[in-house]
């Protein structure tokens, strides 16, 4: 059989199918491919020879070039091409030693593409040098812009902002010329739907205010090595549906008008690395108010660190009446907190548990938890492999013995030096189940067991 010939014909058939597409569609496909690879497509056929020249965007990384001059020359030549359509996308990644020249060139390139009805601006500086690129003010008045993604640059104080179409903003370790720049940008983008901010101590913002009538999704990552009590995030977004906060440095989180919230992921310790003082009433009230604002969610992830702060401060939990899906990351010593938290979720149906070893000496308290019935729980997944040790088995027992309508419990099995898989399975079979219809599905590396 001529398998080589068949492969060539199949390859030609794929090429022909792609070539039969309209040029405008091919150019849109190429928009998501690194521009150097797009240029290489010119050797495919006569039709493809100049097609790359009409791709309405640039996607380029410095490390794709032999040296700095080749990098600059390529970008300059591409931007100099005549185009009938707008310049839709400018994606730039650079990491080079030519600091002064790079700053000048990047600003010049941004000004060029902004004047061509740019829709997507994505600039990432991997240099991490002493001086960053300051984004030119022309970006603030790019009325065609839809998506703005920046990393390791400086945003200047705007005199005028006109960004009526911007829906997505992602800022990663960005500096601001003053503390109000980001607040101005957010409040001026009337179509903003998604906001991601990854912060560091260099951004010089003590109080971050996120006020938006249109915002649907907000993710906040705090990367400050040291926190202080002045750091605060205040959110006022009445249409917000998705909230994701991972931050151990910011001391205060405040929310209002959060009735539209559907899903939240919370990993916060409110700048409380040390054991909090139980009489810190202002801190306790702030945390209680924050929890009350997110209590309308239907889906929630909450970390063991957050649970511990809530527990140690003696915070009163609100009722999460709408919550149907709960994902909890907890350690051995916080199992009691899991039980307490579940009592505040009267309608939860699905529970995912990430169960980790505790470094604390009081981990044995897991064995003495007051009984509590989880009357609505139908599905549970334990993500940590069960090895047969007492604490892991106690988690399984606690759920099975207190869930009257549980339908399925999924867990992974991992044999240990002390116990083989068969011994662990036998122990699982002896655990009483409050639900008569519950199935325990046990996954191990080579098989799956259903303990009916």
From Swiss-Prot:
Pfam families: F-box, FBD, LRR_At5g56370. The keyword Repeat applies. LRR repeats lie at residues 125-152, 174-199, 221-247, 279-304, 327-355. Keywords: Leucine-rich repeat, Repeat. PROSITE patterns: FBOX. Residues 361-413 form the FBD domain. Gene3D superfamilies: 1.20.1280.50, Ribonuclease Inhibitor (3.80.10.10). CDD domains: F-box_AtFBL13-like. It comes from Arabidopsis thaliana. Residues 15-65 form the F-box domain. PANTHER family: F-BOX/RNI SUPERFAMILY PROTEIN-RELATED, PROTEIN WITH RNI-LIKE_FBD-LIKE DOMAIN. This is Putative F-box/FBD/LRR-repeat protein At1g78760.
């Amino acid at each position: 059989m001529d398998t080589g010939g068949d492969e060539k014909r199949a390859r030609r058939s794929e090429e022909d199918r792609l070539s039969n597409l309209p040029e405008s569609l091919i150019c849109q496909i190429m928009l998501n491919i690194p521009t150097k690879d797009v240029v290489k497509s010119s050797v495919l056929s006569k039709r493809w020879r100049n097609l790359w020249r009409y791709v309405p965007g640039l996607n380029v990384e410095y490390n794709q070039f032999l040296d700095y001059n080749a990098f600059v020359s390529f970008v300059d030549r591409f931007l100099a091409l005549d185009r009938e359509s707008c310049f839709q996308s400018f994606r730039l990644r650079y990491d080079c030693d030519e600091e002064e020249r790079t700053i000048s060139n990047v600003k010049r390139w941004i000004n060029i593409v902004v004047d061509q009805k740019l829709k997507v601006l994505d600039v990432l500086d991997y240099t991490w040098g002493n001086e960053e690129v300051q984004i030119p003010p022309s970006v603030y008045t790019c009325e065609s812009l839809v998506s703005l993604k920046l990393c390791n640059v400086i945003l200047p104080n705007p005199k005028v902002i006109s960004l009526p179409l911007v829906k997505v903003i992602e800022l990663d370790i960005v500096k601001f010329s003053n503390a109000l720049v980001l607040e101005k940008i957010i409040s001026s983008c009337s179509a903003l739907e998604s906001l991601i901010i990854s912060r560091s101590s260099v951004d010089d913002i003590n109080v971050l205010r996120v006020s938006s009538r249109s915002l649907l999704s907000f993710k906040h990552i705090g990367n400050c090595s040291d926190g202080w009590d002045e750091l605060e995030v205040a959110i006022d977004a009445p249409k917000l549906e998705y909230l994701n906060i991972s931050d151990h440095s910011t001391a205060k989180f405040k929310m209002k008008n959060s009735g539209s919230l559907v899903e939240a992921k919370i990993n916060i310790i409110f700048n409380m690395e040390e054991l909090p003082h139980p009489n810190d009433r202002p801190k306790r009230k702030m945390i209680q108010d924050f929890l009350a604002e997110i209590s309308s969610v239907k889906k929630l992830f909450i970390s063991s660190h957050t649970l511990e702060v809530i527990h140690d401060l003696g915070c009163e939990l609100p009722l999460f009446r709408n919550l149907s899906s709960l994902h909890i990351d907890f350690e051995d010593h916080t199992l009691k907190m899991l039980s307490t938290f579940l009592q505040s979720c009267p309608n939860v149906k699905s529970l995912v548990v990430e169960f980790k070893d505790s470094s604390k000496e009081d981990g044995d308290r897991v064995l003495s938890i007051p009984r509590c019935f989880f009357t609505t729980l139908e599905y549970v997944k334990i993500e940590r492999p069960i090895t047969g040790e007492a604490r892991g088995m106690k988690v399984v027992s606690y759920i099975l013995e207190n869930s009257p309508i549980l339908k399925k419990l999924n867990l992974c099995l991992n044999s240990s030096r002390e116990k083989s898989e068969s011994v662990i399975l036998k122990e699982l079979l002896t655990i009483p189940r409050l639900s008569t219809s519950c199935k325990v599905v046990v996954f191990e590396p080579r098989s799956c067991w259903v303990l009916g």
